Amino acid sequence: MCFFNCIPVFIAKEQYWQKRFIDKGLPIVGDDIKSQVGATIVHRVLARLFEDRGVRLDKTYQLNFGGNTDFYNMLERSRLKSKKISKTDAVQSQLEKELPTDDVHIGPSDHVPWLEDRKWAYIRLEGTSWGDQPLNVELKLEVEDSPNSAGVAIDAIRCAKIALDKKVSGSIESASAYFMKSPSIQMRDDDARRAVEEFSDIN
């Protein structure tokens, strides 16, 4: 048996829960699933690209709209706290120096019933390039929300089965870093992918 925490409630990253899973000899992958090509992974990659190319990221936002029950539930603003933390930390973790709180806004924004299971994300990054010149990126991402996470969940299940076969317990750091927004240890996405490939090598 293993546990997958695909929602933004922090379990796999918490020492208390990690110890309990280790004591029981069970693997856990979490927390908060990162879609195959969703707003978080796109935002992370662009934020990292700014840094890698020597552009200072000054301000950024990510606004998300959807029509499914996930977005409907988040109309109750008290449910947004952990989701905003999860999505914001996922992006901030890719920066050498975190942006001030007032310069980053990331989170679910509203429920639009006629979108049904579609999700729209608007992402903007404002930066300063060589010679103190402004450099801005703005994009809109449209996805079918539910299936965008399905393949990721399947790959996470595969990693957990490998963990069971190898008798590895507790938080599976490589799988959590690659497949989840809020793992116990954040990695660059290319590093996390390589770590998953190494972990999955059963030879």
Name each region found by the language model.
Residues M1, C6-P27:
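Rossmann-fold NAD(P)-binding glycine/threonine-rich loop
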Residues P8, G170-E173, A177-Y178:
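Flexible, active-site-adjacent loop/turn segments at secondary-structure boundaries
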Residues K19-S169, E173:
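Active-site-lining helix/loop region of Rossmann-like oxidoreductase modules
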Residues A175-N203:
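N-terminal charge/polar-biased segments
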